[in-house]
Amino acid sequence: MGDKTKVQVSKLKPGRYIIIDDEPCRIVNITVSSPGKHGSAKARIEAVGIFDGKVRSIVKPTSAEVDVPIIDKKTAQVIAITPDTVQIMDMETYEMFEVPIDTGVAEEIRDQLKEGINVEYWETLGRVKIMRIKGEGE
C-alpha cells in the first residue's frame, strides 16, 4: 500500500491522522505558538500511534508540509483465531489477512472476537488493524 499524502501543518486538527517516525498516528492535541515579531509560528503536535499506542510529538512550522496516511476502512469476517493471530477475510475482495493479536487488534475488542463475526479493519502503509466489531446490518 504505502499510500500517503502531504498536508500543510496549519490544516491539521485533533482527531485527524499524521505520520510521525514512519508510524501512522491519531492527533490528540495541537498547540500553536508565535515566537515574536520575526519568524513563523510553530505547531506542537501530540499524537498516539494507531498500531503501537505510543505517544509521539513533533514541532514544525505551521507552513511546513507533513505526511498524512490514507486509511482504507473495510469490512471483513473473522475466519480463525489462534493464540497469536486472527485470520480475517475481506468481504468484497475475499482477500485473506493474518493479523497479529498484540498489535493488530484494538484492545477493547480482543475478548469479544469470535469466528464468523464481521469486523471493521483499517489498512494503511501496508499494515492491517482490526478496529471494531460490526453489528448486524452494518
Swiss-Prot record:
User: Which residues carry the post-translational modification Hypusine, per the record?
Assistant: K37
What does the UniProt keyword field contain?
Cytoplasm, Hypusine, Initiation factor, Protein biosynthesis
Cell compartment(s), UniProt: Cytoplasm
> Do the record's keywords include Protein biosynthesis?
yes
> CDD domains attached here?
S1_aIF5A (cd04467)
An individual GO BP term = positive regulation of translational termination
The molecular function terms in GO held by this entry are:
ribosome binding; RNA binding; translation elongation factor activity; translation initiation factor activity
Gene3D superfamilies from the UniProt entry: 2.30.30.30, Nucleic acid-binding proteins (2.40.50.140)
Q: Which domain of life is it from?
A: Archaea
Q: Give a Pfam family name.
A: eIF-5a
Please list the coiled coil stretches. Answer: none
Q: Which residues form the signal peptide?
A: none
Main location per UniProt? Answer: cytoplasm
Q: Does the keyword Transmembrane helix apply?
A: no
Record's NCBIfam families?
eIF_5A, PRK03999.1
Q: What does this protein do?
A: Functions by promoting the formation of the first peptide bond.
Q: Which family does it belong to?
A: Belongs to the eIF-5A family.
Its protein name is: Translation initiation factor 5A
Q: Which organism is it from?
A: Pyrococcus abyssi (strain GE5 / Orsay)
